[in-house]
Amino acid sequence: MNSYFNSMKPIICLFLSGLVLLTACQSSKRTEGAVPNIDSLEQALAQLTDPLERIDLKRQIVDLTMEAATPEERCRIFEEFATLVEEEVGMLNQRESDYLEHYYEYRYDDDANPIEPHDSIKQKELGYIQRGLQFDEVGEGIVLLAPAPTLFAKYLSQLPTYYQEYWQLLRDSENIAPDACLVLTWRELGDLIVRYEAYAESNPEQKELFVRLSDNYQYLQMVYMTGTDNTPIANESGSLDPELKSEWQRFMKAYPNSLTTELIKEFLQRKNYSDLNAMQERLEEVQKTSNHPLLLASSFL
């Protein structure tokens, strides 16, 4: 019996080796087959002009390339997808500008009573929703098509935590003041600024991302300290808005080491807040000379 098994060993080994080789060859063929597939999809993408079709096809490409990529490559793949989506959604907003301008007319009568949108309107909107888009009411009667979180969620979950946090900061900073009217509360704006500062402190090695966050951070800080055209920080006599003053005091107490706290302390010493130009110039001066990582990053732009 032993001699029988001994005589079979070389055959079994050869058989197993053949299986391994066959499997490897099949795997190699599948891999080789995937590359032309992606190339053909990229070529097809270059020929497409319809924004929705381009988004759909780019998503197919991302699905094929994301899984085998390194974390850094995944970030690059995702950014390419997000950039394309942003461009195509911009085209859609132009194409649907007339519809978006009348968005509320389809939902309210002349007396501002809610009405049921026509079936054609429902079908139009459903078509966009099914493709991963949504209608954002950004304030001041402005409605825009935008990517729904679900469009990116699957891919974001495959990215490093530092990148997910960076992405969320960008999203939360979008359209905070449509038509120069702040849609966040002063406290919400202050907390968003703190998140930017905390991100820089927690991820000191992400200097490339700091460069991308720098403009947003400066803008948020400017709005928080000097307001906007339609959300002023003071009344006509130059007296600081009581709600904002209370928020500044809360901010100072909660975040004593923040750069923004230094600005608040200086601004609270003012007797009058009518000269916004002087305040904005002072803030710009501080931002240009500060060694805060998010402000230093702006020098590399």
Labelled PLM ranges:
Residues 150-158, 199-211, 251-262:
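Short solvent-exposed coil/turn linkers within tandem alpha-helical repeat scaffolds
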Residues 22-24:
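C-terminal motif of bacterial Sec signal peptides marking the signal peptidase cleavage site
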Residues 26-29:
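Bacterial signal peptide processing site
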Residues 222-226, 234-301:
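A cross-kingdom marker for long, charged
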Residues 9-16:
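Sec-dependent signal peptide recognition
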Residues 33-145:
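N-terminal Sec/ER secretory leader and immediately downstream segment
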Residues 106-124, 139, 146-148, 156-190, ...:
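Short coil/linker segments at helix-helix boundaries
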Residues 1-8:
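N-terminal secretory signal peptides that target proteins for export/translocation
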